[in-house]
Amino acid sequence: MNIFSPLPEFVMFRCCLFIAILLNLTNADSKAEFPNVAPPTAELVASFQLDTFYTKHVSVKGFPVLGSAKVSDVALQEAAYLIDQMLGGREDIYVALIDSKTRFAIMAPDEFTTEIPAHSDLTPKTFWDRRARGLGATPARPAVSCGEENLLCLRGDPYHEENILVHEFAHAIHDMGLARIDGKFDDRLQAIYDQAIQEGLWNGKYAANNHHEYWAEGVQSYFGTNRLPDHDHNHVDTRDKLKEYDPRLFALIDEVFRGNPWQYTRPEHRRELPHLRGWDAEDLSSFSWPEHLLREGAKQKRDREQAAIENE
């Protein structure tokens, strides 16, 4: 038989069809249509009791990502993308977050923490507006928040070395998601946190503050978006380093996210994705602290330094 003879027509058709299916599956992520940005629906407003502050939203499997008119559409879609990457394969956590009326709120570069309706009762306002460019959700305040400048890596982002959404959404997964679907999770987390502290792990670092921050900092490293070593962080900033340094925390996180291989990369390295095509950070506003919050920041620094001296 001549191996170079033309294949029968039906065989050629099946081969071409198989190749087309493979190409379609391979390129599914890059060609997928992304959720449209639209005003919150009347049903969503009623169900989540949303404030009129929110004029835009994107839905991720029914979970709302919200912003005011000042927030860019691409920021909403970027947040939706990151949330979906983190929770791939965990539809049950989506359901728990929606049932608990959790929502994700984005601050524009010239908006601040206490402008988010769920956080508007935090006082003193200047303290919180300078203290945080993102907060986790609690039953009393069911909004996870983050600044647009961090989502899109805009100029002036004070947290440019890490992704704040991953950290704050990790808190929501813990407190508003897993708390509803796994009654043993918090106790398990507390136990491995206690063991880590007893062994001297994370000594003097932000992850040592409590089991909530231990979890959120671990999730950041698991997804490859933690800070380089500084006064609040040690060398653990990747999945491999986390597995080596604190294997118990790694194992729990890996169990929750079911071995999710996704790793965070900055948006400028993902321009092929539908929501980032044609996007340019230079077209958007940069971030800067207003003068009154710079003064507040200096005061908070002095207070921390004084407290450290008193605790010596």
Question: PLM ranges: what are they?
Answer:
Residues 28-32:
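Boundary at the C-terminal end of the N-terminal hydrophobic targeting segment
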Residues 45, 51-53, 60-63, 71-200, ...:
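Acidic/His-rich structured neighborhood in mature extracellular/periplasmic domains
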Residues 77, 81, 163-167, 210-221, ...:
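A structural signal for well-ordered alpha-helical segments within the folded catalytic domains
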Residues 50, 56-57, 188-192, 301-312:
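Ser/Thr/Asn(+Pro)-rich, low-complexity disordered segments
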Residues 219-312:
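Pan-zinc metallopeptidase signature
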Residues 15-24:
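Bacterial N-terminal signal peptides
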Residues 186-245:
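An amphipathic alpha-helical core segment
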Residues 1-12:
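N-terminal secretory signal peptides that target proteins for export/translocation
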